[in-house]
Structure formats: C-alpha cells, structure tokens
Regions:
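Active-site and NAD+-binding cores of ADP-ribose-processing enzymes
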Residues: 1-30, 34-37, 62-171
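Extended catalytic/binding region for NAD+/ADP-ribose chemistry, centered on the ART fold
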Residues: 33-63
Length: 171
C-alpha cells in the first residue's frame, strides 16, 4: 500500500446539530466506523461533494438534513487504496468493503476493517484514502485527528463564519 502526502480539498455532510464541531471525530468514535473502532476518533471525508452526500444519506433517496462543508487537507502520511484491493497487499485488505455495520451491530462480529485500522495505526499514518461503497467512482478519506502530525493541516473552509459556534444554534 502506498503511503504518501496529500494536499487536497475534501467534503463532509455535517449533521446540523453537531455542525459547530466540523473537525470532531467524536461521532465516529461513539459507535465505530468502517476504519475505526469504538473509542477511536475518526473524521470521514469525501473527495467529491456528491460522494459526501451519498455517504451521509447512505445512498437512500429520503434522508435527514445536512450541511455540506469543504475542508482543506494537507497530511504527510496517508495510505492510499483508491482503486481497492491490490493482490500484493496483506490478504486481510481483501475485506475492506465488508458490510461492517451488519457484522458488528447485527452479528456481533468484529469487522476485519478494524484490524486494518490497527495496521494503519502501527504504520503511523494519519489517514486512508479508499473507494466509496455508496457511490461508485467516489473516493473517501478517513483521518485520525489524534494521529496527525503537528505539521499536518486540517481546516474547514468557512471564511464568512457561517457555521455555528455552539450547539445553542439548534435549540
């Protein structure tokens, strides 16, 4: 798997109630995500606005309101699997697109993607680029805020200060 720096724009649909914390990975830490165990903060972004919407809606036509935000990302150590599994990698990575929610929440089985996340942590990377399972051709980026280097940059683009500053905006 390639590990390289990224300098790109990324997108995320924010739940309005929590849009005052656009850089928080706490939501994913609460129950876990495809590439993070419960308790591990992770920020899931997409490289295309359409992919961000598809991921937020889980590809369903009827979904809750969201706020689309753009992020500027400069991270030195990101693993890349934009094209999916490559046979030269550890065979564990074949399961990157497993139905992790079904495995964990319904069957009570730890998804193999959490072991992959452990490998990423041991490799010292700050994130992973991977194909979207909700939008063919789309690419996602998971970042681990606790693992970003001091020189890494992650900023939400909000030049006019339109995102709320506290949850009080939604009461």
């Amino acid at each position: 798997m390639n590990i390289a720096p990224v300098d790109l724009l990324a997108y995320r649909m924010l739940t309005p109630r929590w849009s005052f914390q656009p850089l928080s990975g706490a939501g994913a830490a609460r129950e876990g995500g495809r590439f993070n165990r419960p308790g591990t903060p992770a920020l899931y972004l997409s490289l295309e606005p359409e992919t961000a919407v598809a991921e937020f809606s889980q590809a369903e036509p009827l979904f809750s309101p969201g706020v689309l935000a753009c992020f500027q990302v400069k991270v030195e150590q990101v693993a890349a699997m934009r094209e999916g599994y490559n046979r030269s990698w550890d065979p564990l990575w074949r399961e990157w697109d497993c139905e992790w929610k079904r495995l964990w929440f319904i069957e009570g089985i730890e998804p193999p993607t959490w072991a992959m996340a452990d490998l990423l942590e041991h490799a010292g990377v700050g994130g992973l680029l991977f194909p979207s399972v909700k939008r063919p051709g789309g690419t996602n980026l998971v970042l681990y805020p606790d693992r970003l280097a001091e020189s890494d940059e992650l900023q939400v683009h909000d030049p006019e200060g339109q995102l709320p500053r506290s949850q009080d905006s939604w009461r």
